[in-house]
Amino acid sequence: MSDSEYLTRAEAALAAIERALDDTDADIELERSGNVLTLEFENRTKIIVNLQPPMSEIWIAAKAGGFHFRFVDGEWRDTRSGTEFFAALSEYATQQAGEPVHFKA
């Protein structure tokens, strides 16, 4: 994948997260600084989602751990488990929010 393709796909993923948080009832604060999204929950825990252009990856740091995602067969997939990005982010956010939080592309 070219650098421009990566940036287009990765930016679309960040935009989808921003849209989902606009539509949720969960108390999650969102801050964006360049290629980094910080989601802060009511209990003061955070999830950090950041782009890693040199690796063509998106990384998530959550209470559950650190995870790397690459674009494979039309989806962002965890490089270790193969879990789809938005499913994983939904799971981590639900754990930290204490209520259902759903993200989708």
From Swiss-Prot:
- A GO BP annotation: iron-sulfur cluster assembly
**Transmembrane region positions?**
none
State any single GO MF term.
ferric iron binding
Q: Which UniProt keywords apply?
A: Iron, Metal-binding
State the source organism's domain of life.
Answer: Bacteria
Q: Does the keyword Iron apply?
A: yes
The cellular component terms of Gene Ontology attached to this UniProt record, alphabetical and capped at eight, are: cytosol
Show the PROSITE patterns listed in the entry.
FRATAXIN_1, FRATAXIN_2
- Indicate yes or no for the key word Metal-binding: yes
In terms of Pfam families, this protein maps to: Frataxin_Cyay
To which protein family does this belong?
Belongs to the frataxin family.
Q: Which NCBIfam families match?
A: FeS_CyaY (TIGR03421)
Q: What does this protein do?
A: Involved in iron-sulfur (Fe-S) cluster assembly. May act as a regulator of Fe-S biogenesis.
- Please state what the protein is called: Iron-sulfur cluster assembly protein CyaY
Give the source lineage, highest ranks first.
Answer: Bacteria, Pseudomonadati, Pseudomonadota, Betaproteobacteria, Burkholderiales
Gene from which this protein is expressed: cyaY
